[in-house]
Amino acid sequence: MSNCFDTNILSSSHINFLFGAGVNGKAFPQLKSFTDTLSKIEELGGNIESGLESGIDSLSSSAHKKIVKDVFIKEFMEADAKMNEKFGKDMSLINLEKMLRKTYLLVNESQNRNPSMKQINIFTLNYDQIVEKTLSSLGYFFSEISASNTTTRAMLLDVIGYNFNVKKYVPTFMVSKLHGDIDNPIIPGKSKYQEMLNEDYFEIAFNMKEKLCRQNSILIVIGYSGRDEHINKILKDCLNAGLTIYWYKFAQMDIVPFEENTQIIVRQQEDYSNPQDTTANCYRDMEQVWEKKLEE
């Protein structure tokens, strides 16, 4: 499979990522694995035949949804605690680390005179702190914002690090948790679209749209199902404003909204019968770009 990145474009763009649950590979359980939450939905009269999200929607009582939310948070935190044992060992997490490290190197070495291009935005739909822990272990400068800290951290949305010793801006990651975090989550279910309109969440979503609509912006999509109506609306608006999207597919049946749009470059798997982590595929594509830069 040929590299989907153009070397010149990648080295002269605002680089942004959109991460869904699939970015963690097999390192973190998917919603279908939250058996305690699924059992509680059934116990309260919900229907889980179509999965956890539809099961939550099938609950008519807000009190029941609150009970399910509490069970979900407890189960999530238990899974998150086990995650700490996997750092440095799980191949999916290693692939994520390699991809973020290569992104840093590319941005650091790019000869962009625009300081804003030193900011790397990661918009994530996940509650976990895998990205933050990975960036911290790499020693990279980053900020994180979610609905639980918007009031105190909104001022960091445009912060970019500067090294006074060498008088140079340094790559800075901005992690925006679009569905909140485990302290203040938007739990799965159609009601999340209404919650996204709340002030705290709206500010994060608005910032995403603003960043993606900038000139010379690209978005690398990894692990996203393509089924979030609110996110898809943002992507559509940004495509109309000139955004280029690089979409990494894991499974052949993965949904890519607006796939007919020529501004969406879909990175297929080399072998769908043996799919590789999309973070690994992205890393390899970036590695090829890096090698070309070294040859220049």
Predicted regions and their residues:
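Conserved catalytic-core helix/loop/strand module for nucleotide-ribose chemistry
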Residues: 1-193, 201-206, 211, 218, ...
